[in-house]
Amino acid sequence: MSTIENLTAHTPMMQQYLKLKAQHPEILLFYRMGDFYELFYDDAKRASQLLDISLTKRGASAGEPIPMAGIPHHAVENYLAKLVNQGESVAICEQIGDPATSKGPVERKVVRIVTPGTISDEALLQERQDNLLAAIWQDSKGYGYAALDISSGRFRLSEPADRETMAAELQRTNPAELLYAEDFAEMALIDGRRGLRRRPLWEFEIDTARQQLNLQFGTRDLIGFGVENAPRGLCAAGCLLQYVKDTQRTTLPHIRSITMERQQDSIIMDAATRRNLEITQNLAGGVENTLAAVLDSTVTPMGSRMLKRWLHMPVRDTNVLVSRQQTIGALQDRFTELQPVLRQVGDLERILARLALRTARPRDLARMRHAFQQLPTLRAQLAEVNSTPVQKLRETMGEFTELCELLERAVVEAPPVLVRDGGVIAPGYHEELDEWRALADGATDYLDKLEIRERERLGLDTLKVGYNAIHGYYIQISRGQSHHAPIHYVRRQTLKNAERYIIPELKEYEDKVLTSKGKALALEKQLYEELFDMLMPHLADLQASASALAELDVLINLAERADTLNYACPTFIDKPGIRITEGRHPVVEQVLREPFIANPLNLSPQRRMLIITGPNMGGKSTYMRQTALIALLAYIGSYVPAQKVEIGPIDRIFTRVGAADDLASGRSTFMVEMTETANILHNATENSLVLMDEIGRGTSTYDGLSLAWACAESLANKIKALTLFATHYFELTQLPEKMEGVANVHLDALEHGDTIAFMHTVQDGAASKSYGLAVAALAGVPKEVIKRARQKLRELESLSPNAAATQVDGSQMSLLMPAEETSPAMEALENLDPDSLTPRQALEWIYRLKNLV
């Protein structure tokens, strides 16, 4: 904006605006003017497009018309929500000076910066989703990543070793805003993400980061947090903390610790796996028919958010898992009485964050009081539950009787939205406030008496006393009787059918009332701030209580789901393997109108890979996904949709299921498929669960078959992972004859004429046929095309019965075989240009080639 270069050419107000705007050049500036927030120049044009509001002009400054857009201050939250959802940040500039005493423009300053990752206002947040601010750092040794939920104070860092792990972490956390260094090399990793913020290199400096974090936590070093030896993670965390301080412009007492997330503590799932399993988001980008949608009947928003974190970070520590299982078992006959009480607790976690940031509104304090009022009942109900983990949660929950009594005394039953509206502090809490209020409230009686007195004295039946915000108190007389107004009645306003007057007595009373109202409101604001000061020392205990209540909500919810949906408690075993009796897909069984066909599964060190064949739509993908989802549920401590489950250690879950062209990156379906396959072959171990669906279908038949065979061979013989390998290549059903630990299973169907019935039952052995033409007919492919396809199928089968199978041998199909050597004569011929040879040279070449052969 060139306007900043010549400030003196502008009006004093525009000079003030331009100076403030220069401090925030890359974000929108909401500049408070009276009852509106105004935007000027390029900001006005952008806001007009983003918010669909009118673009106007405000006079001229420096001889040029000023583009302007404005929004009413009382509707600012709605507009902020729209901007934040589009990844925009906004600096809020307020009037802090008194217009009555200001000689030039009223003093203004930016009081807060609203960004997608640092919002805490409930109007701007998704209630049942975490809203994270993250920072990413990269050097030659790997990545550093830090994520903060400012609405709870939860602060985490990690050090992903490679690009795939970093991509998985970004998808798991899905930050609303992502900070990155100006020299960040892997832009392809983050391009297209919302809320990207480029930051200067010095903000990622390690010594500054340590200093910032120690200052925040009041510590001398970071050893106690277990992050001292995570330099890359600390670089990211330091930048993130600096950014939060810059935007919030206040202390952050609710951010009291930082935790290191280590890969070995949880089951690792890459980005493709999270997407394919539809954990919290379906493949279309929505939330319907996901695992979370089925599993989440939590009664508090903070419980819902915790459940989703559990689903994305399954735990490998069986002690934690068994403890959760026992708690769920203990709560199974209690959820009907506990859930209605817990529902009343609400979102205590986010209320506490707003308290810490000193942005809590009166209704937040009322909700906090209501949450405290539930604790005695909840603690009494939990006292009867015979479970050590439950009793620990009950203890952590606390009771906060004194704080509850304070809020009951101090805050009215149903407070207004904002403290500036007045009427927040309860009568009887503060003597001086009551006196000022009595004076202000006494106005009604006085005005009634004045109106009766003047009406009777003057004999004017249309006379009445009123008040409006612009003209203050007045006496109104109809136009027809206005000529009877006494001489000391001073005309204040003329209306179409009436005249309004002021008298010295009324003016004197108005000053008195307005003074008392102003004094009452100022005192009320002071008392409101003092309430924050009284609550703040208890913040750590309150946050621990909110966390315990959220965990209790998750566990009670899992108990209710287990009971309602007929889930069983899985057993953890030491040896690798998964044994499932009557397993079901948790989502599909809820969507189907007919009963879901349950199926068994047996994977063990002696039976590591299942080759799954059967028709399209026969249920292969459902069977594979349900296995992964049952494993995932077991490793968050939940009961699972099966009659019985025994499950061994799992370190990673991989899925290579379905793919689409990645047009943005210029990658074909086959390239996407091969990239995911390469990731599995490089990173899977004998404790990994691998789902491979239709590998190799994106290329020619023999290429695809060769790749599928080699991948299956590597997974079964070299990696020894627990693998479900679905395929249409019937040649792969020979693998069990050639390799140990591989078995065939199939999903069957019955064909009758042109119709097909899918049995959805898993049986041992290979499928007898594909039923592809029957499925095509079912999909509505024209009959003449199906008829022609049957003819062609018979021709191909008669020409080449199982031709491919005769060419595939496990001992020869490994992709790792060295290429055949090329003969010297062939190499010489390939490099020869016959058109450039003379007859003599050609003759010499013939002799040379003869010698090479």
Swiss-Prot record:
GO molecular function: ATP binding; ATP-dependent DNA damage sensor activity; damaged DNA binding; mismatched DNA binding
Keyword entries, A-Z: ATP-binding, DNA damage, DNA repair, DNA-binding, Nucleotide-binding
GO annotations of cellular component type: cytosol
InterPro entries linked to this entry: DNA_mismatch_repair_MutS, DNA_mismatch_repair_MutS-lik_N, DNA_mismatch_repair_MutS/MSH, DNA_mismatch_repair_MutS_C, DNA_mismatch_repair_MutS_clamp, DNA_mismatch_repair_MutS_core, DNA_mismatch_repair_MutS_N, DNA_mismatch_repair_MutS_sf
Gene Ontology terms describing biological process: mismatch repair
CDD domains the record matches: ABC_MutS1
Database matches in SMART domains: MUTSac, MUTSd
Positions contributing to ATP binding: G614, P615, N616, M617, G618, G619, K620, S621
Gene3D superfamilies: 1.10.1420.10, 6.10.140.430, DNA repair protein MutS, domain I (3.40.1170.10), MutS, connector domain (3.30.420.110), P-loop containing nucleotide triphosphate hydrolases (3.40.50.300)
Lineage: superkingdom: Bacteria
The protein's role, per its UniProt record: This protein is involved in the repair of mismatches in DNA. It is possible that it carries out the mismatch recognition step. This protein has a weak ATPase activity.
HAMAP family: MutS
Family membership noted in the UniProt record: Belongs to the DNA mismatch repair MutS family.
Name of the molecule in the record: DNA mismatch repair protein MutS
Organism: Enterobacter sp. (strain 638)
Source organism phylogeny: Bacteria, Pseudomonadati, Pseudomonadota, Gammaproteobacteria, Enterobacterales
